[in-house]
């Protein structure tokens, strides 16, 4: 099949790629752009591991064709942190032990970011409702709820100097979508 030229805005930068028109946004992000923080999960839209933000709204990248988001801003877990600091959600997930195996964490972080962008101080019920489409088989969700509450309560300064202190501890790497060696999780 003939590849189609696509221009996407991903994590604040325009990216032009040639992709198969039947590929999903998940496949384009991972295989064409090398952004492997977004995970293959069920590929049926049931687990939330592939959640990214499109214009600030969480969507399932496994069910979305990239041609549908060409004029939108796509944010992946790699776009959460700045060059200087991790996002407060990433810090809170690490501190609260909400990133157990780390596989669901990128999708969970993106859903939580969308919630906090629209609801400054969400209730536990609002958090539970927001992340209800993100499955985690390791944590039991309490640590995830607490991490989101902690990030909501922060002033945005959490983790401001962590990037300059050398290699990140394992929980912080997992909260950013990488494994013990710093390589992206599959």
PLM-predicted stretches and their roles:
Residues 1-163, 170-173, 179-186:
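Signature of N-terminal electron-transfer/Fe-S-associated modules in redox systems
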């Amino acid at each position: 099949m003939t590849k189609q030229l696509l221009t996407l805005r991903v994590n604040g930068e325009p990216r032009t790629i040639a992709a198969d028109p039947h590929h999903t946004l998940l496949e384009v992000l991972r295989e064409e752009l090398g952004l492997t923080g977004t995970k293959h999960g069920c590929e049926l839209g049931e687990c939330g591991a592939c959640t990214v933000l499109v214009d600030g709204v969480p969507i399932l990248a496994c069910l979305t064709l990239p041609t549908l988001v060409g004029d939108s801003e796509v944010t992946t877990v790699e776009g959460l942190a700045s060059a200087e600091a991790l996002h407060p959600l990433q810090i809170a997930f690490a501190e609260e032990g909400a990133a157990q195996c780390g596989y669901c964490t990128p999708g969970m972080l993106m859903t939580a970011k969308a919630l906090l962008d629209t609801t400054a101080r969400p209730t536990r019920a609002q958090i539970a409702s927001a992340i209800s489409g993100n499955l985690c088989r390791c944590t039991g969700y309490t640590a995830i709820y607490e991490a989101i509450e902690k990030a909501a309560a922060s002033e945005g300064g959490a983790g401001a100097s962590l990037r300059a202190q050398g290699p990140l501890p394992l929980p912080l790497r997992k909260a950013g979508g990488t494994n013990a060696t710093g390589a992206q999780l599959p």
